[in-house]
Swiss-Prot record:
Residues 111-117 are annotated as: Complementarity-determining-3. Residues 23-117 form the Ig-like domain. GO terms for biological process: adaptive immune response; immune response. Pfam families: V-set (PF07686). The lineage of its organism: Eukaryota, Metazoa, Chordata, Craniata, Vertebrata. Immunoglobulins are composed of two identical heavy chains and two identical light chains; disulfide-linked. One of its GO terms (cellular component) is immunoglobulin complex. Residues 57-71 are annotated as: Framework-2. It is found in: Secreted; Cell membrane. Its main location: secreted. This is Immunoglobulin kappa variable 1D-13.
Length: 117
């Protein structure tokens, strides 16, 4: 059996070697918060270096897969209510829920797509 790896594939694999690129760290705040229905809620995400607008926001409820809310920092995913909005670029980003609804009580995550560890 021919086990040679095509050069193009090998090149792609090398891009994914651990440590091949400097990891970008994200810091969310607050780590937790208390809020009531109808409140305006703001969550921030800060990147350790500039990532342009390569940031997404996800909502996760217990036992469920994360749900994409916002991509490219400010673009609303189809089907997501307009009370969710995202802003920012570079290193500082914000997710805002304009009027919190009962179904919005969940965990929220930011994720960057500018580079990979």
């Amino acid at each position: 059996m021919d086990m040679r790896v095509p050069a193009q594939l090998l090149g792609l694999l090398l891009l994914w070697l651990p440590g091949a690129r400097c990891a970008i760290q994200l810091t969310q705040s607050p780590s937790s918060l208390s809020a009531s229905v109808g409140d305006r809620v703001t969550i921030t995400c800060r990147a350790s270096q500039g990532i342009s607008s390569a940031l997404a926001w996800y909502q996760q409820k217990p036992g469920k897969a994360p749900k994409l809310l916002i991509y490219d920092a400010s673009s609303l995913e189809s089907g997501v209510p307009s009370r969710f909005s995202g802003s920012g670029s570079g290193t500082d980003f914000t997710l805002t829920i304009s009027s919190l609804q009962p179904e919005d009580f969940a965990t929220y995550y930011c994720q960057q797509f500018n580079s990979y560890p």
